[in-house]
Amino acid sequence: MSFLVENQLLALVVIMTVGLLLGRIKIFGFRLGVAAVLFVGLALSTIEPDISVPSLIYVVGLSLFVYTIGLEAGPGFFTSMKTTGLRNNALTLGAIIATTALAWALITVLNIDAASGAGMLTGALTNTPAMAAVVDALPSLIDDTGQLHLIAELPVVAYSLAYPLGVLIVILSIAIFSSVFKVDHNKEAEEAGVAVQELKGRRIRVTVADLPALENIPELLNLHVIVSRVERDGEQFIPLYGEHARIGDVLTVVGADEELNRAEKAIGELIDGDPYSNVELDYRRIFVSNTAVVGTPLSKLQPLFKDMLITRIRRGDTDLVASSDMTLQLGDRVRVVAPAEKLREATQLLGDSYKKLSDFNLLPLAAGLMIGVLVGMVEFPLPGGSSLKLGNAGGPLVVALLLGMINRTGKFVWQIPYGANLALRQLGITLFLAAIGTSAGAGFRSAISDPQSLTIIGFGALLTLFISITVLFVGHKLMKIPFGETAGILAGTQTHPAVLSYVSDASRNELPAMGYTSVYPLAMIAKILAAQTLLFLLI
């Protein structure tokens, strides 16, 4: 393998290619996915320890990965804190703290070295950034450069030993508990109001007096609908801001069937007829590519869309009913209702250009990463003279969460297109895993013949089993969280997309994704801090 030793770029792309290929192979209904890249890197560098990848590669990859996750999760994370987010995150934090305490007890009793013990915890919790944070923290604790080089391999080796069962046990736990609890995923989705429902339009004649302004009906009457058209005295028009319905008006109301039934009871009576038959008004799906309309609530955009109304937003594969507090993102596809001659103006306002979207501005991405790296360098002093910092994982993640929530600063749009986000995220984690895998090959080879390796594997599995049972039992049985959402919380607590993929395939609804996104950011930060704290307590 001398050709891989002599050419680091070739080594990197070979590891990435082989790893991604192996990650697509399904074994017992489960595939490793991008995590296979780590094991390919480990395998090659174990066979030939001189194979290496520049350390900068793993830093860049890690920062890209966590930053893009934070940007996407930011809006939903802070919004969820107003509803179920506090409950879900309390469960996650409690489970992580309890698991870290158990890890400290096991490591102390079994006399496992600190670096390996902290790496075992990160592998059991399947969190690569936390493992990287442990490696980052070692230089501040060890002065001897030669000793540091040897010890820096230990967390990576321990992580790689504990990681495989860290994924497998979580998936098996979810499957077993789902069977034991006799979970009906369809019933859960219906009760939670997240069952996949088609958006429709109905004509409702107003029979209730003193209704709120039409744009306030969803909020004040607690309805997930939007009034897209008003028919009065034989004429149909787009409701202006502040418009009130009159007795006898016919409203075209858009929403899911259940919400439309509730709207009918609150507003008036259903009448026959095609709500879209009027030739004066038309509608069109338009692609959002104009940064000028991104990140601003629809209520503030309304003056730009005179005689036009955005009624639906398709984000990813999900149709959403537009509301006044929603903001547009690059890549959204929106339905606009307007007089036919106004649709061209709507197209110009929203952009409707796939080409423009593909040429997204890299400046906000670079600036956000720069701020994140700087925040990660800030040291927080701890008792005993040591210090704690968020590092190259925590810093970009925290900053990205905030920027994702802010969305834009003046004309500076922090969000990046959905497709670009996913591509950069996949590239980032692949680069990181390839680089970190090759850095531990020599240590992994010696660990194979070391009896302590079995200790790391066994007790790492115990930690994974402990956190799985804690989250699933406490969440579903004691806190009465729907099982699909609880399983998503566990996937988010483990910060592992493969677990989420398994749960989503099994449930076929949005509950797992809701649980996952509500806890993922805080779980990522908590595990980074937990791993570093455990290391400081042990050394």
From Swiss-Prot:
Organism: Corynebacterium glutamicum (strain ATCC 13032 / DSM 20300 / JCM 1318 / BCRC 11384 / CCUG 27702 / LMG 3730 / NBRC 12168 / NCIMB 10025 / NRRL B-2784 / 534)
Record protein name field: Uncharacterized transporter Cgl2211/cg2425
One of the record's GO molecular function terms: monoatomic cation transmembrane transporter activity
Coiled-coil regions, chain positions: none
Organism classification: Bacteria, Bacillati, Actinomycetota, Actinomycetes, Mycobacteriales
Record Pfam families: Asp-Al_Ex (PF06826), TrkA_C (PF02080)
Keyword annotations: Cell membrane, Membrane, Repeat, Transmembrane, Transmembrane helix, Transport
Family membership: Belongs to the AAE transporter (TC 2.A.81) family.
GO terms under cellular component: plasma membrane
Gene Ontology biological-process entries: potassium ion transport
Domain of life: Bacteria
Gene3D superfamilies for this protein: Regulator of K+ conductance, C-terminal domain
